[in-house]
Amino acid sequence: MSEQKSSNQMWGGRFASGPDAIMEEINASIGFDRKLYAQDIQGSLAHAAMLAKTGIIAAEDHRQIEDGLKTILKEIEDGKFTFSRKLEDIHMNIEARLADLIGPSAGRLHTARSRNDQVAVDFRLWVKQELEKTAAALKNLIEAFLERAEEHAATVMPGFTHLQTAQPVTFGHHCMAYVEMFGRDLSRVRDAIERMDESPLGAAALAGTGFPIDRHMTAKALGFREPTRNSLDSVSDRDYALEFLSLAAICAGHLSRLAEEIVIWSTPQFNFVRLSDAFSTGSSIMPQKKNPDAAELVRAKTGRINGSLVALLTIMKGLPLAYSKDMQEDKEQVFDAAENLELAIAAMAGMVRDLTINVASMKKAAGSGYSTATDLADWLVRELGLPFREAHHVTGRAVALAESRKVDLAKLSLEELQSIHPGITDAIFGYLTVEKSVKSRQSFGGTAPQEVRRQIRYWKKRITKA
């Protein structure tokens, strides 16, 4: 009978037999939560130091625990640590190895602690550290866009709505649109860090502990602003993981929109940009091909990240307080999303910096599709005092005439324009060039080159403080 007893010495006391092989397989998380080894050891070191300072464990026990944990950290980092599925997770793998190294003193480490608050602090530490990495990556991407925006503040290109030519803008203005998007992403990252900057360590299983622990001490040691204020919520909460996935999904959406534009712009039909060899691949059969695979893969990774968010939302949606084993399924979603977001941001920063901009193609396209029609309507309002709706109607007739003649608006004769509205003068022709159009958009946040440069100056100052 003793041979049948559970082999897990961490919780096996009340069990008469060990788990079925299938139970062992479905219960084990060491295949993925080993990624938390550094955070688990970090949390245990802080917990042990606090136990010693408060007199809960002896100084000698603390010394042995600390030395043992540092040895384990080195073993893992050197690839010499053997992970066991029978021990389920990273917490018990480390604790079992600690017992091998230092003996009975290892059993004192878990005093006033549960795996519930242990995994909560490990995971929160990991997400917090990952958010800091995401912030740094986003800053790098924003800086890449600022460089290109400054370089092309006056480079004219078509602006689109419905992917149809709308009005001329500058490429610098287009770049600054992405600075705004990724700037909001960076702001969300900073907000998330601020919200999650509390330590759940010391909440124990769910109700706190009767030992005289110092949760403020461990929170400070682990780099948190303060401890969490409710032990039940502390072990139940995965909002920080959901928030990470949410902001990752929003950011991935921005990356995907950018990737789509790069894919379109790099086609021979558009010919706005040329991708560097460093971020392209070729075809195994068609020698002429230069494929935007990096951009396409960034676009595709959005699906994975969105899927991770939906998965964790679904996992958490009906769980009663406090901890349920369902929550073991939280980590793979976050790990996968973090890895793919980091890679996608880095790839996009590289692509943006390496893009060759075809200024001539952009300018030519900017003048097509009657892109200065709005400028004609605005002129009619300013110079002739027409209500905008009437000016819109007059301009629409001018566009229809130009289409029938198969010419641009600026190529219509004064007589043809006056046949639509007799008040039009030859002064209008100075307003129908793409350069004049973009220069006229001087409103705050507009596409005029001087306004683009002003926004660049603002963001350069802001990003240094982000």
From Swiss-Prot:
Compartments it resides in: Cytoplasm
Keyword NAD: no
Gene Ontology CC: cytosol
Disulfide pairings: none
EC assignment: 4.3.2.1
One GO-annotated biological process of the protein: arginine biosynthetic process via ornithine
Catalysis performed (reactions): 2-(N(omega)-L-arginino)succinate = fumarate + L-arginine
Keywords: Amino-acid biosynthesis, Arginine biosynthesis, Cytoplasm, Lyase
Domain of life where this protein originates: Bacteria
Keyword Amino-acid biosynthesis found: yes
A molecular function (GO) term: argininosuccinate lyase activity
Protein name as it appears in the record: Argininosuccinate lyase
Name of the encoding gene: argH
